[in-house]
């Protein structure tokens, strides 16, 4: 148990691990829809300058493993944040997810994409996927604890 000032506890035993796993599954489903050949993948692939071979194909096991791990870490962090923010409704959880996305994900990606020379189009595509995940994670974890 990690205890911070004002008695905010980060107690892993209070996490609903089934809800976290559901968030990870939702994230994978969202990503597969978001980056589907019929949705944003062709535009994203063109903007990143991709060739005929798709990204990550040389080591798909590691790519997917780290993707699932990243989603798991996000869901666990969101579980702690909705508890710390006292979010107990779908609306308050969704707003918590939105504010975390708006305050941390969107600006971080913006700086990274601009300095990498990728511009706003790829930024918008990539952060949109995370926006959906964060709002759903916040809403779900607020009511399913």
Describe each PLM feature range.
Residues 7-145:
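Juxtamembrane/disordered regions of integral membrane proteins
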